[in-house]
């Protein structure tokens, strides 16, 4: 949801019939879109979802809404960030995602429905043999993306001529991926740390989370607390 915020997942009692859904991997499209557009990836046959990041004053700071096809392609994706007063609304149309209002081509796709290019900023993406986006570059910035064996995003590193911004996320549980800690550095100096724990549904997707972010770029460091609310519907 934010560059330093990747979100969700803590206590689930599983039954034997839940295991196939719980172990479903993260699709290349879900993992790659969540890495690039700062929301939390979900696994399994997701039909639609809403993720809200709520601050300790009870205000919704960011909200992401998505609808997916049965093949796992995003049909619509909406993102709003109230602190920065920014909003993005995308709709799938053949090999592009269009601005839902202006119908301008925002994202070019490759393969089934994977990121290929952001024409407006000149960002071009590269995928690996598993179809996950692993690199992105413009004329001034290059970014590498990392995932675990199940496709869960482990962070990304962006480099310019004079700076390197990197986030490394480490899940604390091999199954409950959204219980994690992360460290973000700028030119090898820690600027924030985060820790998250969540409640999970039967697909091992987060239903709610508590996120604590420590801003280490100021003295003394400042702790920010958030809750994350998820509404998820499945096929």
Predicted features by range, described:
Residues 17-235:
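Buried hydrophobic residues that stabilize the cores of well-folded domains
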Residues 1-15:
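Sec-dependent bacterial lipoprotein signal peptides
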